[in-house]
Amino acid sequence: MASLRSAHPADRIIVALDGMAPEQALAFAAQVEGLRWVKVGLELFVQAGPEVVAQLREQGLRVFLDLKFHDIPATMAGACRRAAALGAELITVHACAGSEALKAAQAAAVEGAQGAGQPAPTLLAVTVLTSWEEQRLQRELAITQGIAERVPALAQLSATAGIGGCVCSPLEAAALRAQHPEPFALVTPGIRPKGAAVGDQARVMGPAEAIAAGASQLVIGRPITKAEDPSAAFAACCGELLG
C-alpha cells in the first residue's frame, strides 16, 4: 500500500458495516456523504455473499474484506485468490496461520487480482484481536507472552512472509511503525472519537492520536453507524484528523 501521509482524511477512515442486513448496509453506505472506504465483515459477507463487494464497488466505494482467513496454506491461498478477484483492496489473514500459509496467501492474492483485472490487494495480518486483554490471553489460551511482545513478533513474521501490513490496536501502532516504516500498512480498529462509548473494545484510542502514533487507516463502526446523523459523525471524525 502506498503511503497515506498526505491523503485526504476520508481515505484514512474505513467505516465498518457491522450488524447490518445487506440492504441496510448498501443504503447506509450510499447515504454517508464523502465516504470512500467500507469494511465488510463475516456477518455481512455470510448474509449477502460475495456480490456485496461488487455492489459496494458499484457505488464507488473501496472495500476492506475483513474475513480473517486462518487455515492450512492451500485453503488460505484459495480463499485469498477468490477475495482478490472480487476487487477487495484490503483482505485480512491471521498471522497465527504461520509463514507458509501467509506466503501462499500473498502469492495467490496477486494471482487472483491479475486474473480478474483488478489491482493487487494489500493483505493485512491480524496479530492480537483488540477485544483481548493480556490476563485473559494467559488464562484462556495459556499464552504467557505479553501482548507487547506478541504483537511485534507476529507483525515481523507477517512482514517477512511478504504481507503488506497488519491489523493492530492503536496502542501498539507506535511500536510497530518504528519497526515497520511505510508503506507497511497499519490498520487500527478500537478507534473511539470524542464522546463515543468504548463498547467491546479493550484497547482504544482517538482518531488523531492513532494517526499520530503511526496508523495508516482507522476502522470506525458504531460511533458513525449508530449516530443520529452518520454523515455528520463521519465528517466530525475527518475533522479530528485535520485538527
Swiss-Prot record:
Annotated GO CC locations: cytosol
Transmembrane feature ranges: none
SUPFAM superfamilies per the UniProt record, alphabetical: Ribulose-phoshate binding barrel
Top-level taxon of origin: Bacteria
Record-linked Pfam families: OMPdecase (PF00215)
CDD domains cross-referenced by the UniProt entry: OMP_decarboxylase_like (cd04725)
Binding site for substrate: 18, 39, 66-75, 130, 192, 201, 221-222
Entry-linked InterPro entries: Aldolase_TIM, OMPdecase, OMPdecase_AS, OMPdecase_bac, OMPdeCOase_dom, RibuloseP-bd_barrel
A biological process from GO: 'de novo' UMP biosynthetic process
Catalytic activity: orotidine 5'-phosphate + H(+) = UMP + CO2
Recorded family membership: Belongs to the OMP decarboxylase family. Type 1 subfamily.
Functional description taken from the UniProt entry: Catalyzes the decarboxylation of orotidine 5'-monophosphate (OMP) to uridine 5'-monophosphate (UMP).
Protein name, entry field: Orotidine 5'-phosphate decarboxylase
Organism: Synechococcus sp. (strain WH7803)
